[in-house]
């Protein structure tokens, strides 16, 4: 029986969407009794739980910071665990919209004009 960790929740403002997605994915995967599932959050015990469960795959359903910025990906790669999502470098670049735009422009990928908006502390 293959073990799969469903990584959901997290700290972004899209936390609830991540949890709803995790519930839906869990429901569907349970229909196929080939998998042993564990749903966890990226808390302080994440690596400990990961090592104990020894999954074949981590379904990364996190949004925003930690889930889409290369952070979780770097942990999973250091633990030699397969995961869904882009890799460390592509995630860390894509989360930065200005860098992404510059890469698109340099590679002649059509993209709408942009401007950088900086909030100054009052």
Model-derived features: positions:
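Basic phosphate/pyrophosphate-binding loop/patch that engages nucleotide-derived ligands
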Residues: 103-111
């Amino acid at each position: 029986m293959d073990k799969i960790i469903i990584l959901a929740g997290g700290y972004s403002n899209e936390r609830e969407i991540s949890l709803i997605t995790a519930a839906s994915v869990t429901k569907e995967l349970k229909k196929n009794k080939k998998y042993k599932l564990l749903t966890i959050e990226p808390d302080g015990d994440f690596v400990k739980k990961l090592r104990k469960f020894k999954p074949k795959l981590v379904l990364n359903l996190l949004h925003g910071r930690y889930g889409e910025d290369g952070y979780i990906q770097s942990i999973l790669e250091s633990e030699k665990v397969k995961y869904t999502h882009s890799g460390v470098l592509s995630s860390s670049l894509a989360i930065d919209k200005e860098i992404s735009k510059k890469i698109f422009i340099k590679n002649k990928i059509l993209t709408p004009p942009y401007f950088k908006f900086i909030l100054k502390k009052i």
